[in-house]
Amino acid sequence: MKLLHLDSSALGANSISRELSAAVVEQQRRLHPEVDVSYRDLDRDPIPHLTAQTLAQTDPAEAAAAEAVMQQFLQADVIVIGAPMYNFAIPSTLKAWIDRIAVAGRTFQYTANGPEGLAGGKRVIIASARGGLYADPTNDFQEPYLRQVLGFLGVDDISFVRAEGVAYSPQHRADALASALAGLSEEEAAAGA
């Protein structure tokens, strides 16, 4: 089994989404000892945003880098994404990655019956950290967007591990992280049963 682990937080060691995504990967290692993990830090090693130049793919090095991102996605059975909520959505570094994998004819196609995803059969686990509480979905453009774009590509096995309200106070941050990690432990225990 191949697992692709992505982090997109700019907060480095202070990032809750990084801590959660690492915990998810460790859980997957315990459940599947044979797992082959690839890692990309989209903050430290960002993918260039789409421009007229990158779309034209006139630079062979740029084209090769884009193809490497695509192949890494296509070959993964499980994808773990550390995705903090920035301004109600996702970091632009994560959006740049999505722009490189959402390619007509590769991961989706248009048919007479409408769009069809070509990248099914994958499991995506999103480790989400949010400064506020988003029980009211009108302010949440992160989770619906990720579900929509991944679903458009054919991915229908999508789950979220959330730590919310982490900016309220140090205690709330610790409690939110502990709750998210406890949920992972419960899931692992159920999978092992």
Curated annotation (Swiss-Prot):
HAMAP family: Azoreductase_type1. This is FMN-dependent NADH:quinone oxidoreductase 1. It holds the Pfam family Flavodoxin_2. Keywords: Flavoprotein, FMN, NAD, Oxidoreductase. It is an enzyme of class 1 (oxidoreductase). Its EC number is 1.6.5.-, 1.7.1.17. Binds 1 FMN per subunit. It catalyses: 2 a quinone + NADH + H(+) = 2 a 1,4-benzosemiquinone + NAD(+); N,N-dimethyl-1,4-phenylenediamine + anthranilate + 2 NAD(+) = 2-(4-dimethylaminophenyl)diazenylbenzoate + 2 NADH + 2 H(+). The keyword Oxidoreductase applies. SUPFAM superfamilies: Flavoproteins. The lineage of its organism: Bacteria, Pseudomonadati, Pseudomonadota, Gammaproteobacteria, Lysobacterales. InterPro entries: Flavodoxin_fold (IPR003680), Flavoprotein-like_sf (IPR029039), FMN-dep_NADH:Q_OxRdtase_AzoR1 (IPR050104), NADH:quinone_OxRdtase_FMN_depd (IPR023048). Quinone reductase that provides resistance to thiol-specific stress caused by electrophilic quinones. Also exhibits azoreductase activity. Catalyzes the reductive cleavage of the azo bond in aromatic azo compounds to the corresponding amines. PANTHER family: FMN-DEPENDENT NADH-AZOREDUCTASE 1, FMN-DEPENDENT NADH:QUINONE OXIDOREDUCTASE. Its cofactor is FMN. Homodimer. It comes from Xanthomonas axonopodis pv. citri (strain 306). FMN binds at residues 9, 15-17, 85-88. Belongs to the azoreductase type 1 family.
